[in-house]
């Protein structure tokens, strides 16, 4: 196993522990708490994949971080922070909408790279909007936290989420996953549109109804894909 992979996991475990202690003091905001919860799932998945104990990794990560801080001057820290581009966290959904449990009458699921696409194919003839919480850097989607499909009544009928055991995805990965989700929902004559935030950062152009400009041939292909593979 690559030593960098192990040490990276150890540092991530310790930094998560620090953030958890901060949250336990009731000082974290909603985006902070949301990232904390999702990173916990990711660490568990990575630990299982690597065969490493999280508690042991956390202790090792603490030693690595302490060694770095001991060698780091305040001036070097300021320069490092200034040189790193800042990402923004954008929220279409409330914390309640993100954490709400939902159930499917006709569950369908597809794994596309490091993203999991789920939907209820019992939903028909509904107006549906896609909402997402994600980070943005350089005016492009950086990391998807969670995307969900809502009916006008507020029911959740679809979802795209990163797989904890396979971290890392691009904005193109997210765009393709959204296309698959839209194709699957439209197969049952639902009308799907995306939020203004997703329009701005996931696509550079969209139709008047808030849809990405998928041609009819691509829409049919996506619908067949979700029907046959999900």
Curated annotation (Swiss-Prot):
List the molecular function annotations (GO) for this entry: protein serine/threonine kinase inhibitor activity; RNA binding
Keywords attached to this Swiss-Prot or TrEMBL record, sorted alphabetically, are: Eukaryotic host gene expression shutoff by virus, Host cytoplasm, Host gene expression shutoff by virus, Host mRNA suppression by virus, Host nucleus, Host-virus interaction, Inhibition of host innate immune response by virus, Inhibition of host interferon signaling pathway by virus, Inhibition of host PKR by virus, Inhibition of host pre-mRNA processing by virus, Inhibition of host RIG-I by virus, Inhibition of host RLR pathway by virus, Interferon antiviral system evasion, RNA-binding, Ubl conjugation, Viral immunoevasion
Q: What is this protein called?
A: Non-structural protein 1
Where does the protein end up?
A: Host nucleus; Host cytoplasm
Where do we find the motif Nuclear export signal here? 137-146
Q: Does the keyword RNA-binding apply?
A: yes
Q: What the protein does?
A: Inhibits post-transcriptional processing of cellular pre-mRNA, by binding and inhibiting two cellular proteins that are required for the 3'-end processing of cellular pre-mRNAs: the 30 kDa cleavage and polyadenylation specificity factor/CPSF4 and the poly(A)-binding protein 2/PABPN1. In turn, unprocessed 3' end pre-mRNAs accumulate in the host nucleus and are no longer exported to the cytoplasm. Cellular protein synthesis is thereby shut off very early after virus infection.
Q: Name one GO cellular component term.
A: host cell nucleus
**Source species, please?**
Influenza A virus (strain A/Shearwater/Australia/1972 H6N5)
| Domain comment, as recorded | The dsRNA-binding region is required for suppression of RNA silencing.
The gene it comes from is NS
Residue ranges, annotated region (CPSF4-binding): 180-215
What is one process in the GO biological process aspect for this record? symbiont-mediated suppression of host mRNA processing
List, alphabetically, the Pfam families matched. Answer: Flu_NS1 (PF00600)
Q: How does it assemble?
A: Homodimer. Interacts with host TRIM25 (via coiled coil); this interaction specifically inhibits TRIM25 multimerization and TRIM25-mediated RIGI CARD ubiquitination. Interacts with human EIF2AK2/PKR, CPSF4, IVNS1ABP and PABPN1.
Where is region (RNA-binding and homodimerization) located? 1-73
Note down the stretches annotated as region PABPN1-binding: 223-230
Region (Disordered) location: 205-230
Q: Which SUPFAM superfamilies does the record cross-reference, listed alphabetically?
A: Ns1 effector domain-like (SSF143021), S15/NS1 RNA-binding domain (SSF47060)
